[in-house]
């Protein structure tokens, strides 16, 4: 459950150009600002200064604090890969390989600047993602469901339904 806290916005020194939203969050007990602009996302402290990237150890500490998982290894991700588990997330990220009580390996993705856990990926999620890719016929990115083969089968299904209704009600087209 999110914790509540007070922030005096009059003390924050911000240049507000093309801002879409401002979110106040906590990073290691310190309030930070997540400023989403048209050009991207900025992470600032309450003075308006840019935040430094977290260390690998800090990413492990975050995962230990917000989950019941045991961190094993940390990998920094700064280049996007098509079809990855973290697709659609802001980079850089830390991929923290963890283990649960049943020795299942679980990947926890932590934003390298805000410290927020942005994704948790288990074997069950990977199976779901595979089935989703097969369902929408997008095996690489798993984001585009406008595959031409899917459209052809949709038109055939619509045609079959209409002809089935015509036959059911015995409509004579002559």
Where are these regions (language model features)?
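Conserved histidines in hydrophobic membrane contexts and catalytic metal-binding motifs
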Residues: 1-174
């Amino acid at each position: 459950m999110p914790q509540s806290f007070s922030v005096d916005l009059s003390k924050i020194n911000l240049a507000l150009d093309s801002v879409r939203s401002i979110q106040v969050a906590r990073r290691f007990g310190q309030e930070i600002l997540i400023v989403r602009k048209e050009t991207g996302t900025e992470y600032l402290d309450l003075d308006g200064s840019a935040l430094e990237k977290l260390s690998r150890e800090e990413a492990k500490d975050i995962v230990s604090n917000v989950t019941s998982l045991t961190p094993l290894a940390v990998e920094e991700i700064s280049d996007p890969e098509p079809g990855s588990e973290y697709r659609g997330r802001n980079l850089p990220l830390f991929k923290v390989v963890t283990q649960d009580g049943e020795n299942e390996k679980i990947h926890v993705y932590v934003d390298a600047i805000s410290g927020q856990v942005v994704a948790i990926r288990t074997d069950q999620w990977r199976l779901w993602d595979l089935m989703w890719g097969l369902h929408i016929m997008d095996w690489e990115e798993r984001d585009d469901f406008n595959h031409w083969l899917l459209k052809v089968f949709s038109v055939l299904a619509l045609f079959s339904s209409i002809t089935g209704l015509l036959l059911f009600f015995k409509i004579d087209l002559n």
